[in-house]
């Protein structure tokens, strides 16, 4: 071992010549006299920032106020309830229930989670949640107390944030050829595909595996795509379908949008938030939760909240009340619900802030249908109905007409549990919304009603009626100043559903179900049957927004065989068949209403012949281009096949010595074509015997 200079001087020792050659003098590592030492904090600042820091653990602790004050005998039950609610957000490693001198809990508790993320999630999910009618949780992080106590007395304005450029949300409307888009869901994973219905072949725009856990839906105007996840709902938008917004609502399974896409409602049948946040209304632009509601005491139909046409109001039914809320405050209109004893159902007009509701019979008081204006709560029209078992409200898409289907009875038998009706017959009460004093016409049908549908643009409606063995389809015309007239009646038809084109005039008659599949494409101008077709076991039909195409599909959720979808023209010509294993859903992307006035639309239709030559020329160019592309594609495929075949033939020839060696040098390559050396052996065996008696 080498020694320092000082040691060598103090303890000189004889050294041999070899030692002098093997050991060199050790260099001097002492700092110079003018050396200034640089502190580690300055020299290694970037490295020290990454050094793990000791945590005091307060970030993991939450304070829950608003708990019940209980004695020792009920403390265990309280702990069980608290753990059931708060353990859903993470592992609770410690809990503390302070008590008073009398042994009662103080009403606030401390819970410690295993990490800060779980604590923050618990605060976000449970703050202001109701435990029961008397107790509401007020939940904060323990560190919040220090944060709020350190707020400076003098306010400092926040620094302006840089503007974040959003992608174009209406990009899909800018396509020069006005191609529509559609969504395809595959499997239970669920993989999603977004296609553009281009010519000659649809174009795949986006495909992602496991994009949603259950299913996906478009918003009403087509701006957003909503997907479902365990922790909530995500909205996607823009050309690349990037995430636009996400809403925390564990195990949400249902969603509905307001008509103008300002708000959305989610429902979780078995959510993680307890019983007070089953329904949550969120602001789509900001992602904020605007209001939440507990579940109702009895069964309700989805959607429970129904919106007015301009997003100003939304309403729901309660026990003998109709609760109307207004935005953006989300409070009750005039701070109180409307008392309507016996109310059963309601529906908003698609074009006005008017809602229709019906009230059931009560002893000698007849049933009643009422039209109510909001927000002034004025009854603009009502009609009494007698011997009513049920009613269904059907608005025409333009809001020009309202139809109330009334199920009436001749006899009724009331048991302790159930009510049985007999001698049923049916009325269709037609309200003329655009006429003075809103006159009402009535159409009576004695046979059972299978389906009803308004023409979206026009004044016709269609009805499927009769027993399953003798189905008839009737078309009526609504007239001003007189009762609706029967235009056409088709008898003995095997259909159970009606699907009008969004642009009116054309309708598809369909038989949905595992044993169905029949289709009929009908022009209601002269009731010409344009085509008769079938799609066996089809489970759904959907028109595209323009009324040019219609899709039929067999979902794997209903049937495991022959899953896929067909695309038809509005005349019933099959354009494309797509068989896809695991096919689950198909939805056309909606379009917003046109910006053109009715006058401008009529002018375009009037001068449509001027544009025919342009359209035909463009179609010919597209067809020619498509043909060239198809020929080039097939030529390339044939070239690849020829190259592959030649390579395999060469490989087969190179393996011939090995084949001869394995077959004792007997050439068997040409046995199939050698008729001289080939022996054909026929073997017959008894299968079964049948005896037929001939008279």
UniProtKB/Swiss-Prot annotation:
Matching SUPFAM superfamilies: DPP6 N-terminal domain-like (SSF82171), RNA-binding domain, RBD (SSF54928)
Residue ranges occupied by any RRM domain in the UniProt entry: 60-144
Residue span of region Disordered: 1-43
Pfam families: eIF2A, RRM_1
Compositional bias per record (Basic and acidic residues), positions renumbered to this chain: 1-10
The keyword Transmembrane is assigned to this record: no
Repeat (WD) residue spans along the chain: 164-205, 295-335, 338-373, 444-486
SMART domains: RRM
Gene Ontology cellular component list: eukaryotic 43S preinitiation complex; eukaryotic 48S preinitiation complex; eukaryotic translation initiation factor 3 complex
Single annotated GO MF: RNA binding
Keyword Magnesium appears in the UniProt entry: no
Domain of life, source organism: Eukaryota
Gene3D superfamilies, A to Z: 3.30.70.330, YVTN repeat-like/Quinoprotein amine dehydrogenase
GO biological process: formation of cytoplasmic translation initiation complex; regulation of translational initiation
Subunit structure: Component of the eukaryotic translation initiation factor 3 (eIF-3) complex.
Known role: RNA-binding component of the eukaryotic translation initiation factor 3 (eIF-3) complex, which is involved in protein synthesis of a specialized repertoire of mRNAs and, together with other initiation factors, stimulates binding of mRNA and methionyl-tRNAi to the 40S ribosome. The eIF-3 complex specifically targets and initiates translation of a subset of mRNAs involved in cell proliferation.
UniProt-recorded name of the protein: Eukaryotic translation initiation factor 3 subunit B
Lineage, top ranks: Eukaryota, Metazoa, Ecdysozoa, Arthropoda, Hexapoda
Originating gene: eIF3-S9
